[in-house]
Amino acid sequence: MEDVLDVYHRPHDPLRPVVCLDETSRQVLANTRDPLPVAPGRPARHDPEYERKGVVNCFLVTEPLRGWRQVRLSDQRTRLDWAACVKELIDSHYPDAERIVLIMDQLNTHSPASLYEAFPPAEAKRLDDKLEIHHTPKHGSWLNVAEIELSALQRQCLNRRLGDRTQPGRHHVRLALYHQRCPHQAQTPLSSNSRVTEH
């Protein structure tokens, strides 16, 4: 536990950013009938029947000291999906960083072995060399800021029917709502600081 707390005490360094990663899965449910909209004195009403549209895995990556977050959606929760998320983090979001200090829980897919399963050895080594991994202790995942962000996201926008993943705007609206309710954590507009990507 002290290891993770020591990492959080480090000052902000763009060359060695402290990034937290966590994931959760959500069932995608669509309405079978259009809900009745909000009216004066009456909340929105939804039919209790729904249609199952599968499950989506949400990777949430955040850099707390910068106020940046991203949600990445995938169809599965495998080593390959985690490796793809980490590759995107390194190559797209932190290409100039010397090393990324990555805090995450001890899920079996959260290891350099996943990189070697997903990519050729040279590429896996390149990605692994860019990471400084710190795992939260067992039963201590509450130390991971990404888990706290996922909890807030769950309470504010994932606790209702998500609809159909083929409607990309819906996810952006829900994340925008979450972003709007957390203005103290993000100083720049949603379009440049937070986003949803689907893979």
Language model region names:
Residues 44-50, 123-145, 161:
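RNase H-like polynucleotidyl transferase catalytic core
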Residues 32, 164-199:
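C-terminal domain-tail junction helix/linker
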Residues 69, 138, 146-161, 165-167:
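Active-site proximal helix-loop segment of RNase H-like, two-metal nucleases, encompassing DDE(D)
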Residues 19-21, 101-104, 134-135, 174-177:
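Short beta-strand segments
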Residues 1-87, 186, 190:
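Extended, low-complexity cationic-aromatic segments
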Residues 97-110:
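Acidic/histidine-rich, metal-coordinating catalytic segments
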Residues 113-124:
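Short, aromatic/basic amphipathic alpha-helical patches
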